[in-house]
Amino acid sequence: MKLDHLVLKNYRNYAAVDTTFSPEINVLIGANAQGKTNLLESIYVLALARSHRTNNDKELIRFGSEFARVSGQVSRQSGSHQLELIISHQGKRARIDRIEQPKLSQYLGHFNVILFAPEDLAIVKGSPAGRRRFIDMEFGQMSPKYLYNLSQYKTFLKQRNAYLKQLKYHQAKDLVYLDVLTDSLAAFGAELITARAKLLETMSDYAATIQQDITKGRESLHFSYQTQVDPSLRGNSEQVYTALGEMFAKQQAREIEQGTSLVGPQRDDVLFIVNDKDVANFGSQGQQRTTALAVKLAEIDLMKDQTGEYPVLLLDDVLSELDAARQTHLLKAIQTKVQTFLTTTSLEGIQKEIIATPAVFKVDEGTLARA
């Protein structure tokens, strides 16, 4: 999968961009606050129809403009496709090959990207909510079914929590309606837990191999999926559904008392176990960075495994956060097979023998030009 051509209009600090890219490594070089991250963000938005930096789409529109447009020509094994997003103050419109998509869910999955930014180095020690977002964003790209189940689960979770609050404050008393919401939540929750268990197991295997390679066999790594359902049941969605139903029944009184759902995949987490210890609590900073790198590289392998194609990789000023050994391992792992966009203020310090002939672009005050 490659991004061949990108067109921006009124996006962040870019009035207009129209450029083609190398199918291998593209380096965006420039001083801070010139628009390097904005350009990477636009590629991310083209793929996922949302920003990783803000939940307010209006921030993507250039100051004083009515709309922002992001358009790209993407090459896949199935052929070349034009993707386009128009972001206005009224909302978003998405097109594939100039055909408007009635739902954003029908647009997603046509262009897959993986972003690696400095904040991702903290994924192993960050919050469970951050790790769930990470899982959902990546797995949703790989599987329309996962994305659908996640969307449905969030809808019913919101409705159920609102109804639990009504029950708590005696504004409602119909427990039959609560049972209907609970059953829907258990059904979609079971699908999510089963999918997460399967994908995390595969991803863990990839990450374990990468961790061993980086550390020359000194460190073992595996993922420990933390969910309320017994591990022996997670491979069967019907058994997970039954288990969730039983847990909801046991917790119903407490849930009404607290006005929120206490059961379900919204409480999941993933622990990263290095040499039999939780690296977040017991690992050194070096081990945590190695683990974060292994996790991100495992994402690439998992996406290739699930979709049949490598995603596009976005490296936002992350090389400066890695020492020479980790930097070399990252660049060797992606060399020639993964189209990569990386931002930097200088080519100094980058392993030049690894990226001997990159396409270099100069970013300066919202303009982009070949260097």
UniProtKB/Swiss-Prot annotation:
ATP binds at G30, A31, N32, A33, Q34, G35, K36, T37. It is found in: Cytoplasm. GO terms for biological process: DNA replication; DNA synthesis involved in DNA repair; double-strand break repair; SOS response. Pfam families: SMC_N. Its main location: cytoplasm. The keyword Transcription does not apply. Gene3D superfamilies: P-loop containing nucleotide triphosphate hydrolases (3.40.50.300), RecF/RecN/SMC, N-terminal domain (1.20.1050.90). Keywords: ATP-binding, Cytoplasm, DNA damage, DNA repair, DNA replication, DNA-binding, Nucleotide-binding, SOS response. One of its GO terms (cellular component) is cytoplasm. GO terms for molecular function: ATP binding; single-stranded DNA binding. InterPro entries: DNA-binding_RecF, DNA-binding_RecF_CS, P-loop_NTPase, RecF/RecN/SMC_N, RecF_2. The RecF protein is involved in DNA metabolism; it is required for DNA replication and normal SOS inducibility. RecF binds preferentially to single-stranded, linear DNA. It also seems to bind ATP. Belongs to the RecF family. NCBIfam families: recf. This is DNA replication and repair protein RecF.
